[in-house]
Amino acid sequence: MVFLLCFFLVADVSYGINKDCLLPKVVGFCRARFPRYYYNSSSRRCEKFIYGGCGGNANNFSSYYECHIKCFGPRAIIFPEDSPKEN
């Protein structure tokens, strides 16, 4: 039981996460349609969204890779099944 508790405390990805990654997704108020990624703190994943081009916040990344590196650090990258791998 103690082992499981320690495992979950260490495995919590929000521990030490970049504060920008905890900001909410903001689509922006302009009408452009830029595909972007943000860190979803509920699902604990980088997810795709459509950015309007202005407004927004720092939780807005041009690629899945950029989001993952910024929010998880230089760990192994796991690409979602529905996204192509980015170079």
Swiss-Prot record:
Compartments where located: Secreted; Nematocyst
Classification via InterPro entries: Kunitz_BPTI, Kunitz_BPTI_sf, Prtase_inh_Kunz-CS, TFPI/VKTCI-like
A GO cellular-component term linked to this record: extracellular space
Propeptide residues per the UniProt entry: 76-87
Location of the BPTI/Kunitz inhibitor domain: 21-71
Disulphide-bridged cysteine pairs: C21-C71, C30-C54, C46-C67
Gene Ontology MF: a single term: serine-type endopeptidase inhibitor activity
Swiss-Prot/TrEMBL keywords: Disulfide bond, Ion channel impairing toxin, Nematocyst, Potassium channel impairing toxin, Protease inhibitor, Secreted, Serine protease inhibitor, Signal, Toxin, Voltage-gated potassium channel impairing toxin
Record site: Reactive bond: R31, A32
Signal peptide coordinates: 1-16
Membrane-traversing stretches: none
Other known facts: Negative results: does nos affect the inward-rectifier potassium channel (KCNJ2/IRK1), as well as Kv1.1/KCNA1, Kv1.2/KCNA2, Kv1.3/KCNA3, and Kv1.4/KCNA4.
Similarity comment: Belongs to the venom Kunitz-type family. Sea anemone type 2 potassium channel toxin subfamily.
Its job: Kunitz peptide that directly activates neuronal GIRK1/2 (KCNJ3/KCNJ6) channels (EC(50)=80.9 uM) resulting in larger K+ currents. This activation is independent from Gi/o protein activity, and has only a minor effect on Kv1.6/KCNA6 channels (13.5% inhibition at 1 uM). Serine protease inhibitor that inhibits both tissue and plasma kallikreins. Has hemolytic activity.
Name recorded for this polypeptide: U-actitoxin-Avd3n
Organism listed in the record: Anemonia viridis
Lineage, highest ranks first: Eukaryota, Metazoa, Cnidaria, Anthozoa, Hexacorallia
